[in-house]
Amino acid sequence: MERPTGVYFQTMTMKQIRERLKQCDLIIIPVGSTENHGPNAPTGEDTFLVTRMAEQVALKTGCTVAEPIWYGYHPYHHIGMPGTVPVKDEAFIDYLVSVIAGFWNTGFRKQILLNGHGQEFVIPIAIHKFAKIFQVPAIIINLNWYHAIQDKFKTKEEGGPYETPFIHADEVETSWSLALFPEFMHQEWAVDTEPKGFLPEGHIDKAGNLLHRPIAWYGHVGGGPIEVVAYPEGVVGKATLASAEKAKEGVEALLDYLEKLVRDIMERFPAGKLPPAEMLSQRPKEELEALTKEPLTEGWRNLYTAGNLWG
């Protein structure tokens, strides 16, 4: 992420950023976490997954990648696990709002928050909070990578490559990590655990709600144990079954989808263009024109004059 690959916002000068905005004003913001993923995988696994994905798509499409959000939201059953760094709910949401606003004010009015962690139900709150505060035209999308290719997580019984369903630091997630950043993995240290639940199977879903069960994985407290007690290893499932080969088809499909998403947005709304402002906001026309001008040009108003971000 510190290498001058030509895709990361924080490695660019403002001159380079201005030139890039003329070609593509879409930025991908990887939203990850710092979380215990067992003895064999790095604590930044969720973050590395989405940064590697974003890098590949940016190299193909010309979009920009923000340095990732390293610390994320965590549900109750994650709390207390060493190696996991949870952020207070309100602080996480407000931090995302601030990041979205900062990039919008710079000229990136099209943003994809590419999520790699179990916080898919929180990120949309930040997107809508941004919209409510500022009420400016924008395309802000939350994409959870595992939702883009749900058919690629099938078990062998369903015609897929995996022995077990996707949970956490398990066969599936470890396979994807081996495919995307093998240099950080120590598969010789992998361990297995047995997933536990207090209700019969079929009610509560697992990671990403990929099984389409009635109750979302985050829609309960008490349906399963807390991780620090039940899974001190940091693994929920069979990490030893993982291999990069199992994830290969899914990785290719996901990158294809991400590339398509970026290209579809940019073809519909080329650099400098957005959906009709009058369809997205009831702010006065003159105000919207000033806010959406190229930053630092004549008549431009900075975004922070349009809403109170500071409470």
UniProtKB/Swiss-Prot annotation:
SUPFAM superfamilies for the chain: Creatininase
Required cofactor(s): Zn(2+)
Entry's Gene Ontology molecular function annotations: hydrolase activity, acting on carbon-nitrogen (but not peptide) bonds, in linear amides; metal ion binding
Pathways involved: Polyol metabolism; myo-inositol metabolism
Claim: Hydrolase is one of the keywords in the record: yes
NCBIfam families: diketo_inos_hlase_IolN (NF041098)
Family: Belongs to the creatininase superfamily.
Functional summary from the UniProt entry: Catalyzes the ring-opening hydrolysis of 3-dehydro-scyllo-inosose (diketo-inositol) to 5-dehydro-L-gluconate, and thus probably functions in a myo-inositol degradation pathway together with IolG, IolM and IolO.
Record-given protein name: 3-dehydro-scyllo-inosose hydrolase
Gene that encodes it: iolN
